[in-house]
Each structure stands twice: as C-alpha cells, then as structure tokens.
Amino acid sequence: MAQRVTYRRRLAYNTRSNKTRIIKTPGNNIRYLHIKKLGTIPRCGDTGVPLQGIPALRPREFARLSHNQKKVQRAYGGCLSANAVKDRIVRAFLIEEQKIVKQKLKQMSQK
C-alpha cells in the first residue's frame, strides 16, 4: 500500500505559497518538499526588456546581495538596459547640438 504524505507546515490548502514536490529520503520515506516561489527578472524602466547580469531572486534574497551584485558597472546599471542608456546619450547629445545650432543662427541673424 502507498505511504500517506501530509503537509509539513500548518497551511493545509493548495495555494501558490504552499507548492510541494514528493521526494524520497535516504531512510526510504516519502515526504513533501516545499518549493520556494521563483523570483521575477528585473526589467528595464524604459523598454521593459529583461536586464542582463542581474539575478532573478525573491525580494528577501535580492536584499541580501551585495551592492555590486545588484547592478551592472555602467551608468544606470541595474535600472536601464544598455540600449536604453545608449539612446538617452544620443538624444541628449543631439539636443545639445540643436541648442548650439539655434544659438549660432541667432547670432548670424543679429549681425
């Protein structure tokens, strides 16, 4: 006859936080192994693409990481993707160029 298995925690319902797997112990007993929930991948604030180089962890594990494991060595590392940062830099450069051109045209018209 099959061995009966009961939950090992007080929560008796099949909820998202109470997911289990059946395992066999070295003593040949069958037990429930409680499975931790998966972490979500951090995403870029501008484009929404997953950020590379940053682990997908639950909030508590993520808070335990050291500072350099939570980010990438770049401007806006850990917040924006590389392409989003590149686009911001190019846009800022073009805006500055446009301001300079506008000033030059104003000076030319005053002469």
UniProtKB/Swiss-Prot annotation:
GO terms for biological process: cytoplasmic translation; ribosome biogenesis. Pfam families: Ribosomal_L34e (PF01199). The modification Phosphotyrosine is found at residue 76. PROSITE patterns: RIBOSOMAL_L34E. InterPro entries: Ribosomal_eL34, Ribosomal_eL34_C_sf, Ribosomal_eL34_CS. The keyword Ribonucleoprotein applies. Keywords: Cytoplasm, Nucleus, Phosphoprotein, Ribonucleoprotein, Ribosomal protein. It is found in: Cytoplasm; Nucleus, Nucleolus. One of its GO terms (molecular function) is structural constituent of ribosome. One of its GO terms (cellular component) is preribosome. Coiled coil: none annotated. Belongs to the eukaryotic ribosomal protein eL34 family. There are 2 genes for eL34 in S.pombe. PANTHER family: 60S RIBOSOMAL PROTEIN L34. Component of the large ribosomal subunit (LSU). Mature yeast ribosomes consist of a small (40S) and a large (60S) subunit. The 40S small subunit contains 1 molecule of ribosomal RNA (18S rRNA) and at least 33 different proteins. The large 60S subunit contains 3 rRNA molecules (25S, 5.8S and 5S rRNA) and at least 46 different proteins. Component of the ribosome, a large ribonucleoprotein complex responsible for the synthesis of proteins in the cell. The small ribosomal subunit (SSU) binds messenger RNAs (mRNAs) and translates the encoded message by selecting cognate aminoacyl-transfer RNA (tRNA) molecules. The large subunit (LSU) contains the ribosomal catalytic site termed the peptidyl transferase center (PTC), which catalyzes the formation of peptide bonds, thereby polymerizing the amino acids delivered by tRNAs into a polypeptide chain. This is Large ribosomal subunit protein eL34B. It comes from Schizosaccharomyces pombe (strain 972 / ATCC 24843) (Fission yeast).
